[in-house]
Swiss-Prot record:
<dbReference type="Pfam" id="PF00410">
    <property type="entry name" value="Ribosomal_S8"/>
</dbReference>
<keyword id="KW-0689">Ribosomal protein</keyword>
<dbReference type="GO" id="GO:1990904">
    <property type="term" value="C:ribonucleoprotein complex"/>
</dbReference>
<keyword id="KW-0699">rRNA-binding</keyword>
<protein>
    <recommendedName>
        <fullName>Small ribosomal subunit protein uS8</fullName>
    </recommendedName>
</protein>
<keyword id="KW-0694">RNA-binding</keyword>
<dbReference type="InterPro" id="IPR035987">
    <property type="entry name" value="Ribosomal_uS8_sf"/>
</dbReference>
<comment type="similarity">
    <text>Belongs to the universal ribosomal protein uS8 family.</text>
</comment>
<comment type="function">
    <text>One of the primary rRNA binding proteins, it binds directly to 16S rRNA central domain where it helps coordinate assembly of the platform of the 30S subunit.</text>
</comment>
<dbReference type="GO" id="GO:0006412">
    <property type="term" value="P:translation"/>
</dbReference>
<dbReference type="GO" id="GO:0019843">
    <property type="term" value="F:rRNA binding"/>
</dbReference>
<comment type="subunit">
    <text>Part of the 30S ribosomal subunit. Contacts proteins S5 and S12.</text>
</comment>
<dbReference type="GO" id="GO:0003735">
    <property type="term" value="F:structural constituent of ribosome"/>
</dbReference>
<dbReference type="InterPro" id="IPR000630">
    <property type="entry name" value="Ribosomal_uS8"/>
</dbReference>
<keyword id="KW-0687">Ribonucleoprotein</keyword>
<dbReference type="GO" id="GO:0005840">
    <property type="term" value="C:ribosome"/>
</dbReference>
């Protein structure tokens, strides 16, 4: 049984990125698709799609296409899970984290859905800090 599917997703992306893989396959969930949407919008991944699992009626996989520079430079330098099942981390609108002085993003789960730290600051809402990406 997996206790932290978000950490599993981030680890798979980090490992595939370190090994210069073009794609990474992850079991699908709505929150993972939302995280992939944020990563695509912020320019960390090239794209993602949802594929059905062959032989299963309802199971789906999230296929993330990683992004590299012209000389195979990684677009993701690092990923860190912040709030874990054993230790939740929350931030108020006044105390939102800044990743690398604003060069990275913090993914935050709010009442308005998953947002980046900049979107939270603009809307003046806080929430659970899921991960840092830089």
């Amino acid at each position: 049984m997996m206790t932290d599917p978000i950490a599993d997703m981030l680890t798979r992306v980090r490992n595939a990125n370190s090994a210069y893989h073009d794609t990474v396959v992850i079991p699908y969930s709505k929150i993972k698709a939302n995280i992939a949407e944020i990563l695509q919008r912020e320019g960390y991944i090239a794209g993602y799609r949802v594929d059905p699992v062959p032989g299963h009626a309802t199971a789906k996989n999230l296929v993330i296409t990683l992004k590299y520079g012209p000389n195979r430079e990684r677009s993701i330098s690092g990923v860190r899970r912040v709030s874990k099942p054993g230790l939740r981390v929350y931030a108020k609108a006044e105390n939102l984290p800044r990743v690398l002085g604003g060069l990275g993003i913090a993914i935050i789960s709010t009442s308005a859905g998953l947002l980046t730290d900049r979107q939270c600051a603009k809307r003046r809402i806080g929430g659970e800090v899921l991960a840092y990406v830089w």
